[in-house]
Amino acid sequence: MAKKEIGKIKLQIPAGSANPSPPVGPALGQHGVNIMEFCKAFNAKTQDQKGMIIPVIITVYQDRSFSFITKTPPASTLLLKAAKLQKGSGEPNKNKVGKVTKAQVKEIAELKAPDLTAADTEAAMKSIMGTARSMGIEVTE
């Protein structure tokens, strides 16, 4: 018989550095999950992506066991890294804070493809360009 699911937890955690402190500890603790077991498994799975923020969906079962799925880093994080910025513009319509090329946008779109609902790479690129525009990052040829 399949395990009974009692909850899903969505978190964004820096790769390879999950620890029991907030936000991880309280989120898992209220579902009765072994926090250190999750931290060790997550850190082992994401150690090659250090420095990136990784969204994770944790499924908690009735017997207090869990499974988790890691997603690709958020488009905003990838755009900031490509433009070599710390943060986006506070006024994206007035202040442009950086530039990325179409080639970089295509690279990000291909990396994000499994998590996007876009039909093809072109549509994924448009989605990423929209994110860039809302962050005050200019897309150049």
Swiss-Prot record:
Any one Gene Ontology BP term: translation
Record Pfam families: Ribosomal_L11, Ribosomal_L11_N
GO cellular component: cytosolic large ribosomal subunit
Family annotation (InterPro entries): Ribosomal_uL11, Ribosomal_uL11_bac-typ, Ribosomal_uL11_C, Ribosomal_uL11_C_sf, Ribosomal_uL11_CS, Ribosomal_uL11_N, Ribosomal_uL11_N_sf
Keywords: Methylation, Ribonucleoprotein, Ribosomal protein, RNA-binding, rRNA-binding
SUPFAM superfamilies: Ribosomal L11/L12e N-terminal domain, Ribosomal protein L11, C-terminal domain
Record-linked HAMAP family: Ribosomal_uL11
Quaternary structure note: Part of the ribosomal stalk of the 50S ribosomal subunit. Interacts with L10 and the large rRNA to form the base of the stalk. L10 forms an elongated spine to which L12 dimers bind in a sequential fashion forming a multimeric L10(L12)X complex.
PANTHER family (alphabetical): 60S RIBOSOMAL PROTEIN L12, LARGE RIBOSOMAL SUBUNIT PROTEIN UL11M
Annotated family: Belongs to the universal ribosomal protein uL11 family.
Functional summary from the UniProt entry: Forms part of the ribosomal stalk which helps the ribosome interact with GTP-bound translation factors.
Name this protein carries in UniProt: Large ribosomal subunit protein uL11
Lineage, highest ranks first: Bacteria, Pseudomonadati, Thermodesulfobacteriota, Desulfovibrionia, Desulfovibrionales
Gene: rplK
